A protein has these predicted regions:
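Divalent-metal coordination cores built from histidine and acidic residues
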Residues: 7-10, 89-198
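Di-metal (Zn2+ and/or Mg2+/Mn2+) metal-binding site signature of metallo-dependent hydrolases
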Residues: 68-91
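Short beta-strand/loop segments at the ligand-binding rim of alpha/beta enzyme cores
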Residues: 69, 74, 194-203
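Short, intrinsically disordered, charge-balanced linker/junction segments flanking boundaries
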Residues: 214-221
Length: 221
């Protein structure tokens, strides 16, 4: 992690950049433009983007990007790493070369099999990777109470505790949307635990509309 002062000085040209990505094009996702630009890196941060290469950036190292387009890292906002049948480190190796730099995972599959220990494993196995991994805590463990044999049951109190863990940003897809709409005690408590913690509630309500959709949204999803 670089200091803020160092980053400012690098942007102003008062200290050398660590890396200059030179000769490529840049996709501006705000304006839709593609234009020539050199990119100056200091530490692990972008210090400066030199549109049209007017500033003649210099750095300790250079990467020649001619023929390439620089784009922001892709963010996959919902993924089940377990479905890929690989561990988080192997998943990172697979997706990083194609531009995905951040994922938000819902580990409800391993949670339904292995319970809290499964969520802890996913948290630890994704720590320190070059891929940024954020977690949401499964709201449906078991997925269909009374219809299946799951490895655990996550009540609101369990979810509330796991929401305090690092890199946890929300409650995963609230698949029991009838329970949310009807405000059953268990699902209402799970939603309230997420809201009380200041976290996002992720929706999952296929084909729901009208008053039911309005009620689902009114519940905080």
């Amino acid at each position: 992690m670089v200091s803020r002062t160092g980053l400012v000085e690098a942007a102003r040209g008062q200290r050398p950049l660590d890396l200059v990505i030179r000769g490529g094009l840049l996709l501006n996702v705000y304006t839709g433009e593609v234009y020539p630009a050199d990119i100056g890196i200091y530490g692990d941060r972008i210090a400066i983007v030199d549109r049209d290469r007017r500033l003649g950036l210099q750095g300790r190292n250079e990467f020649q990007a001619r023929g390439h387009i620089a784009v922001p890292g892709f963010i996959d906002t919902h993924v089940h790493i377990e479905s890929t049948m690989v561990t988080p480190p192997h998943f990172a190796r697979a997706v990083l070369p194609f531009g995905t730099t951040t994922v938000v995972i819902d580990p409800h599959e391993i949670g339904n099999v292995y319970g809290r220990a499964g969520i802890e494993y996913m948290l630890k196995a994704s720590e320190g990777l070059p891929l940024r991994v954020y977690l949401t805590i499964p709201s449906s463990v078991p997925a269909v109470p009374g219809l299946e044999t799951a490895g655990a049951v996550f009540e609101a109190s369990d979810i509330a505790e796991m929401l305090t863990w690092p890199r946890v940003i929300g409650v995963a897809e609230l698949m029991d949307y009838p329970g949310i709409i009807q405000q059953t005690p268990r699902m209402a408590a799970i939603a309230e635990a997420g809201l009380r913690a200041g976290k996002r509630l992720e929706g999952h309500a296929p084909l729901v509309g009208g008053r039911d959709l309005a009620a689902y949204l009114a519940a905080g999803v």
